[in-house]
UniProtKB/Swiss-Prot annotation:
Protein name from the UniProt record: tRNA sulfurtransferase
GO cellular component: cytosol
Pathway(s) served: Cofactor biosynthesis; thiamine diphosphate biosynthesis
Entries under Gene3D superfamilies matching the protein: 3.30.2130.30, HUPs (3.40.50.620), Rhodanese-like domain (3.40.250.10)
Domain of life: Bacteria
SMART domains per UniProt: THUMP
GO molecular function: ATP binding; CCA tRNA nucleotidyltransferase activity; tRNA binding; tRNA-uracil-4 sulfurtransferase activity
Catalytic activities: [ThiI sulfur-carrier protein]-S-sulfanyl-L-cysteine + a uridine in tRNA + 2 reduced [2Fe-2S]-[ferredoxin] + ATP + H(+) = [ThiI sulfur-carrier protein]-L-cysteine + a 4-thiouridine in tRNA + 2 oxidized [2Fe-2S]-[ferredoxin] + AMP + diphosphate; [ThiS sulfur-carrier protein]-C-terminal Gly-Gly-AMP + S-sulfanyl-L-cysteinyl-[cysteine desulfurase] + AH2 = [ThiS sulfur-carrier protein]-C-terminal-Gly-aminoethanethioate + L-cysteinyl-[cysteine desulfurase] + A + AMP + 2 H(+)
First-level EC class: transferase
Keywords: ATP-binding, Cytoplasm, Disulfide bond, Nucleotide-binding, Redox-active center, RNA-binding, Thiamine biosynthesis, Transferase, tRNA-binding
Phylogenetic placement of the source organism: Bacteria, Pseudomonadati, Pseudomonadota, Gammaproteobacteria, Pseudomonadales
Domain THUMP: 63-167
Chain positions recorded as ATP binding sites: L185, M186, K267, G289, Q298
Length: 484
């Protein structure tokens, strides 16, 4: 299979040195993204095209390659093509007929040809010759250049002919690694996950910082969605996940700060801590999911007061987004279900939160705060690469694993719905229920408490994590299914 990758349009208008740097980075990223699927993958090209060639014939692996490329920043679109040496017009006609002939009977069609290089003919001459030949030989109803039912597309580059089989949309943006790096304040909800996606899509390597307000389930959920975002949109790069224990900070705010300023103070403490993390990691900006006036702390006066606490640039990609648009985007990118089932810990709730915070007033309230508490939180912060968070969480968990299903036991497939659809779990004589990992914690209580449940995932890590959490919640009827 050969793919022709067309770069994001904004890359092509850059100066030659910048364009070459961006395209080299994109080629490097494509190799990194697809390396585990085909170690012999070839990626070559220049200007606005990259040619990706693989000898893999497994249809499932090819589908996975295409899916990964659609989620790789820097790609405008890409084409599945059949490559041939360039022959004469009759040869071009024969190649197009071989691929499109059975689609044209009784259909209106058009022929599109793009060329690069010097040739003794024009693109229009190719289109006319091939179009008339296909109409004559394939029983087509006619030619319609405006709204054809079938498009016969090809590209001619120097002495090569590419007959286009299918076009796939890309993510756009710039290649990860070509721009600066940022730190995303991640809560795992709709806003922060979409904000992270927007930055990654634009081409910025996005690291994550999570402020734990007092819940292991919340931390686990945020780790899972951060891992999902990295795996789907940023796997070409090394990304960090930093977790900062903020329980004592919340307690200090609750006991020392006036009710109306609790929310603003908490946000300022988070920005203080995030700035310190960003400085240590040498990151260029902070990213939050705030939108104007979505909640009381996000009015312009409040945001202005919050930002004064740091000299680090704070980016808010969703600042003028409507909530429904954010939810729709989350659904589109696959984070909506994570957000919908994310445990929430609202430790700082103001009965009458201010929407017009004053700098002098917030400084007065913060003067009561013991900053040693914030320092301790930063000292206790943990850091790991995001590709390892799931594995690390799964270590040393005491959960019973079984290799065989006993009569009456139910296997729960907790894999992502895409994996469930691609490779359904079928066990003869065994009841299998599908309940994705992001919903298992909130929906397990709906199941019959008198039945025994075995959680299943591909590697056994996610199932072990969630079984451990359910056992800690008091559910004694859960085990992990690990077939031999």
């Amino acid at each position: 299979m050969k793919l022709i990758v067309k770069t994001f349009q904004e890359i092509t208008i850059k100066s030659r040195p910048v364009r070459k740097r961006f395209i080299r980075q994109l080629a490097k990223n494509i190799r990194a993204v697809l390396r585990d699927l085909d170690p012999e993958l070839k990626v070559e090209g220049e200007w606005d095209n990259l040619e990706v060639e693989t000898a893999v014939v497994d249809a499932r692996v090819r589908r996975e390659m295409i899916e990964r490329l659609t989620c790789t920043p820097g790609i405008g679109h890409f084409l599945e093509v059949h490559e041939y040496p360039l022959g004469d017009f009759d040869d071009i006609l024969a190649k197009c007929k071989a691929h499109f002939g059975d689609q044209l009977a009784g259909k209106m069609f058009a022929v599109r040809c793009k060329r690069a290089g010097k040739h003794a003919f024009t693109s229009m001459e190719v289109e006319r010759y091939v179009g008339s030949g296909l109409r004559r030989e394939c029983g087509a109803a006619g030619i319609d250049l405006k709204q054809p039912e079938v498009e016969v597309r090809m590209e001619i580059r120097l002495d090569r002919l590419f007959v286009i089989h299918r076009q796939h949309p890309g993510l756009g943006g710039y290649p990860l690694g070509a721009l600066e790096q940022v730190l995303v304040l991640m809560s795992g909800g709709f806003d922060s996950t979409v904000a992270a996606y927007q930055m990654m899509r634009r081409g910025m390597i996005s690291h994550f910082v999570f402020f734990n307000l007092g819940g292991r389930a919340h931390e686990l959920g945020v780790m899972e969605v951060a891992h999902y975002l990295w795996e789907k949109y940023g796997r070409s790069q090394r990304v960090l996940f930093v977790s900062v224990p903020f329980e004592e900070v919340v307690g200090e705010i609750l006991t020392k700060v006036d009710d109306s300023y609790m929310g603003v103070t908490l946000k300022r403490m988070m920005l203080r801590a995030a700035s310190r993390v960003a400085e240590r990691l040498e990151l260029d900006a902070l990213v939050t999911g705030e939108a104007i006036s979505q909640v009381s702390s996000q009015t312009l006066p409040n945001l202005s007061v919050i930002d004064r606490v740091t000299d680090t640039l704070v980016l808010r990609p969703l600042i003028v987004s409507h909530k429904q648009d954010i939810i729709d985007t989350a659904r589109q990118i696959g984070t909506a279900e994570f957000a919908r089932h994310m445990p929430e810990y609202c430790g700082v709730i103001s009965v009458n939160p201010t929407t017009q915070a004053k700098p002098y007033r917030v400084e007065h309230e913060e003067s009561k705060f013991d900053m040693a508490v914030l320092e301790r939180a930063l000292e206790r912060a943990t850091q790991r690469t995001v590709d390892r968070v799931i594995d690390e969480l799964g270590q040393d968990l005491s959960v019973e694993e079984v290799a065989e299903v006993l009569p009456g036991q139910i296997v729960i497939d907790i894999r992502h719905p895409d994996a469930q659809e691609d490779e359904p779990l079928a066990l003869e004589g065994v009841e299998v229920q599908a309940l994705p990992f992001y919903a298992i914690n909130s929906r397990f209580k709906e199941l019959d408490a008198n039945r025994q449940y075995l959680l299943y995932c591909d590697k056994g890590v996610m199932s072990r994590l969630h079984a451990h959490h359910l056992l800690n919640e008091g559910h004694t009827n859960v085990r992990v299914y690990r077939p031999a």
